[in-house]
UniProtKB/Swiss-Prot annotation:
Disulfide bonds: none annotated. S-adenosyl-L-methionine binds at G63, W65, D83, D99, D124. It catalyses: uridine(2552) in 23S rRNA + S-adenosyl-L-methionine = 2'-O-methyluridine(2552) in 23S rRNA + S-adenosyl-L-homocysteine + H(+). This is Ribosomal RNA large subunit methyltransferase E. The keyword Transferase applies. Its EC number is 2.1.1.166.
Length: 209
């Protein structure tokens, strides 16, 4: 992609962002990001979160999902969050900055988690976009595969998984893989997700262990 095209695309994203009612509402209410509303919509439909839960949040920064989840799970719950980028503190959230694709970071993350004791794994991870779908889609699918592998390592029986996935090559097979591991799997497109975005959210419940 040329710099001119990339600049035009970036400019369009910025205009959409500042015109977007969800982004504006997030700023007004002091929410970390518009992602707060995506998790709120998923929770309204699927009731994944309950007080006292233990949650792992991958790709957490700037903290929209953790911020919403912390409100639901309360003081008796805990959230272990991880991201490459820094994240301002959130009460009830233990944050680890680093790339969990690296063994040392993954080990540090797992040290904070009791095996098979996590109630929900949630992942809003996305790769740095190159503007070339043949590059971007495999990168995105690699991240969601890692998130699914995290479920295998830490999720309790009957636990839940919510993950952002971009539709494209590998998507259908990924949904099949998730269905093999969970009793119920739904694909959600929240109203707060931009219509032209290929992102959807897989909501899986009843981890078979």
């Amino acid at each position: 992609m040329s710099k001119q095209k990339h600049s035009a695309s970036s400019g369009r994203w910025l205009k959409e962002h500042f015109d977007d009612k969800y982004a504006n509402e997030a700023r007004k209410k002091g929410y970390r990001s518009r992602a707060y509303f995506k998790m709120e919509e998923i929770q309204t439909k699927d009731k994944l979160l309950t007080p006292g839960m233990t949650i792992v949040d991958l790709g957490a920064a700037p903290g929209g999902w953790s911020q919403y989840a912390a409100k639901i799970i309360g003081d008796n719950g805990q959230i272990i969050a991880c991201d490459l980028l820094p994240m301002d503190p959130i009460a009830g959230v233990s944050f680890l900055q680093g790339d969990f694709r690296e063994e040392a970071v993954l080990d540090a993350l797992l040290e904070r988690i009791q095996p098979n004791m996590v109630d929900v794994v949630m992942s809003d991870m996305a790769p740095n976009i190159a503007g070339n779908n043949s590059v971007d889609q495999p990168r995105a699918m690699y991240l969601v595969e890692l998130a699914l592998d995290m479920c295998r390592q830490v999720l309790a029986t009957n636990g839940s998984f919510v993950v952002k996935v971009f539709q494209g090559e590998g998507f259908d097979q990924y949904v099949k893989d998730v269905r093999e591991m969970f009793k119920t799997v739904k694909v959600r497109k929240p109203d707060s997700s931009r219509a032209r975005s290929r992102e959807v959210f897989i909501v899986a419940t009843g981890y078979k262990g």
